[in-house]
Amino acid sequence: MQRGWAHHDSELVNRDSGLMDSLPELRRNLEKTSLNDVVVPIIGDSLVVARHWAGDISMLFIDGGHGPVPAHSDYESWASKVTRGGFMAIHDVFPNPADGGRPPYEIYCRALDEGLFEQHSSLGSLQVLRRL
């Protein structure tokens, strides 16, 4: 979601720093949905945080970079941490390349092809998989 990438929301650019910053939007959404007591945002570089993550995850939401390296790195770093029966949601999954970037679709297919996950549900471009 960085400035200059094919897919980013220019409204998320911090006016002071000029950098993308979705944290205020996340906080507003957690407040609106009364999820502050069950969702704990961890702020940091995805790969650095994954390296130090020790526990299982019951719900993983991948909505990161749309380039091949960031998307596959997120999948490789986090998918194995989802507990059996847990969920992995991937945003911006578009089977038709004309509709959006391919890497989120590629990691979606990879998760199914590797046999670690099964399709659970979908809503628009959001695909939710369940860990086997």
Predicted region positions:
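S-adenosylmethionine/decaboxylated-SAM
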Residues: M1-L132
